[in-house]
A protein has these predicted regions:
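Metallocofactor- and cofactor-centric catalytic cores in central/energy metabolism, strongly enriched
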Residues: 1-130, 144, 148-160, 165
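Nuclease catalytic cores that cleave nucleic-acid phosphodiester bonds
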Residues: 135
Length: 166
């Protein structure tokens, strides 16, 4: 299975929209939460093909989509510094800045590492006292508690080489 081409055929799409029109008996509001989802819905015309009873609400966007370009460029500049271990969740590694992304900085020799938790970055700071460890703390309310815990833990452990970029 290719998982792309088989969903792009017009007859198949029309059959799905016919089924939606037939089976939609009350109003629905759907929120897309990522700018990429919104872009795809609009570009493909799905928003215009939905039954009138189905409304789309444009949500807040995911952190990857709404992080300002200037913030990504700041992250790239920090990640290039030889004294820095720059850490981030994996989804931010491919997000382009003005000229490049974090994976390209890593390929060029920058010490960029993917972590699964801000506490992984704290652990790196503890293991590398001679390097500044920076965690790229993008996100919303759901990521604030673990970020705060990482700052608290670094302070509790006396790690002056840990910081976050928000």
């Amino acid at each position: 299975m290719r998982f792309v081409d088989e969903y792009r055929g017009e007859p198949e799409a029309q059959a799905l929209f016919s089924a939606l029109r037939r089976d939609t008996h009350h109003a629905w509001n759907l929120m897309e939460v990522c700018g990429g989802q919104t872009h795809t819905l609009m570009r493909s015309g799905i928003d215009r093909m939905l039954p009138e009873a189905i409304g789309l609400i444009h949500g807040p966007g995911c952190p990857v989509c709404v992080t300002p370009l200037e913030q990504i460029d700041r992250a790239l500049a920090i990640a290039r510094r030889p004294e820095v271990i720059f850490t981030s969740f994996g989804d931010m590694l491919r997000v382009p800045g003005s000229t490049t992304d974090l994976l390209a900085v890593k390929s060029a020799g920058g010490d960029v590492r993917m972590v699964y938790s801000p506490l992984d970055a704290v652990k790196l700071a503890r293991e590398n006292p001679d390097r500044e460890v920076v965690f790229f703390a993008v996100g919303f309310e759901t990521t604030a508690p673990p970020n705060a815990m990482a700052v608290w833990q670094a302070k509790r452990l006396g790690l002056p080489n840990f910081s976050i970029l928000t």
